[in-house]
């Protein structure tokens, strides 16, 4: 996959796309569990997800109880699949690397079942959404910022 950063256009073997998603989902029961250590686990895991699944994580913003993703992927990967991949792999890694989190939750799930997804256009709302996601961490250590 080749990406034109200036226009945020990606190219594959047989298609060219400009699809960016703003995805939001909270921690189960809206618990404030996204501390610095958990955020670091999420960022490290997101980098592995990028490599393994060819999902471009353009920005990640964490508040104490929810996360915002600005991402892009090949059109054959549905937004729901991106959410499923991200939630399942990050939850597994969080439970594996910070076992104390399990005591805060019951039922063995880290993320809620639901989520929000919207498309972000190149003209108009891209900068607004990107700024909003990056501002999730004003006054705290940033979860991840990528330009």
Positions of predicted regions on the chain:
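Basic nucleic-acid-binding interfaces
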Residues: 1-144
